[in-house]
Curated annotation (Swiss-Prot):
Originating species: Acanthamoeba polyphaga mimivirus
GO molecular function, a single term: DNA binding
The name this protein goes by in its record: HMG box-containing protein R545
Amino acid composition bias (Basic and acidic residues), ranges on this chain: 176-187, 197-214
Start-end of Acidic residues biased regions: 16-29, 93-121
UniProt DNA-binding residue ranges: 183-252
Location of the region described as Disordered in the Swiss-Prot/TrEMBL record: 1-282
InterPro entries: HMG_box_dom, HMG_box_dom_sf
């Protein structure tokens, strides 16, 4: 019974072991002789041995190639139980093949696990990328530029602000009187003469400019009055008439004249020696 299970489990291994045993028996039966036919036979046998070895190596390579082809199912299965094998080279060959198969299976398992891990790592990343798109930062709105005001409107606004400024002041606008309320200065005789004579000259000589009428009226005034432009005397009751300062002057306005210093007395000039000698002689 154990022999049959061995042949079913690993038929290739049994065939390799049988070939090796046949080769070993033939080598033992060949007598060693010098030269001749026996020598040729001995030379031919190593070729057969090498061919059998090559066939065994090819079969082992095929078994190694078939092991990864079985896929994930064979790689995950538990290693097959070792069948009882004949003593000698069969044990070593079977052990080597099982070790190689187990190594190939472990490598395949590691590759499968690493591929699964890589797929599992990449899958959630893709989902996360789809679910959570990158939020765009809200673009800052540029402050709207104010359109430059037209020059005409700006001037009007400035004028209005200037007009409103005195109204908002602290009573200054009320205290100041308008120009119409101020008393007008009385016209001089020269101005009165011009106001009468100018329209007469326009009627006499129409079509001339205003300045020429002024010159003509001024020339007539100088001929009549000798070139003096007298102003009318101020009325007694007018507010604008200035009071004449009192004679003698007030104490505040009158300036005291500085007292004159007495002239310093001159020192008598020294007499010369000649005059002194003359007086003594007298």
């Amino acid at each position: 019974m154990p022999k049959k299970t061995a042949t079913k489990a690993n038929p290739k291994e049994v065939s390799d072991s049988e070939n090796d045993s046949v080769v070993s028996e033939e080598e033992d039966n060949v007598p060693v002789t010098k030269g001749g036919k026996n020598a040729k036979a001995s030379k031919a046998k190593p070729k057969e041995v090498s061919e059998s070895d090559n066939s065994g190596s090819e079969q082992s390579e095929e078994s190694e190639d078939e092991a990864p082809k079985k896929g994930k199912v064979n790689a995950k299965k538990a290693p097959a139980k070792k069948a009882p094998v004949k003593k000698g080279k069969q044990d070593s060959d079977s052990d080597n093949e099982e070790d190689e198969a187990s190594e190939d299976g472990s490598d395949d398992e590691e590759d499968v696990v690493s591929a699964d891990d890589s797929d599992s790592d990449e899958a959630p990343k893709g989902k996360a990328a789809k679910k959570a798109p990158a939020k765009k930062a809200p673009a800052k709105k540029a402050p709207a530029k104010k359109a430059p005001a037209k020059k005409g409107k700006a001037k009007d606004e400035d004028d209005e602000s200037e007009d409103e400024a005195p109204k908002k002041g602290k009573g200054k606008g009320k205290a100041t009187k308008k120009d119409g309320d101020k008393p007008k200065k009385p016209l001089s005789d020269y101005q009165k003469f011009l106001s009468k004579r100018m329209p007469e000259l326009r009627e006499e000589e129409p079509g001339k400019p205003y300045k020429e009428y002024m010159k003509m009226a001024g020339a007539e005034w100088t001929e009549q009055n000798g070139g003096t432009k007298k102003k009318p005397a101020a009325k007694s009751g007018s507010k604008t008439a200035k009071k004449a300062p009192a004679k003698g002057g007030s104490k505040s306005t009158a300036k005291k004249a500085p007292a004159k210093k007495a002239p310093a007395k001159k020192a008598p000039a020294k007499k010369s020696k000649k005059e002194a000698s003359d007086e003594e002689s007298d």
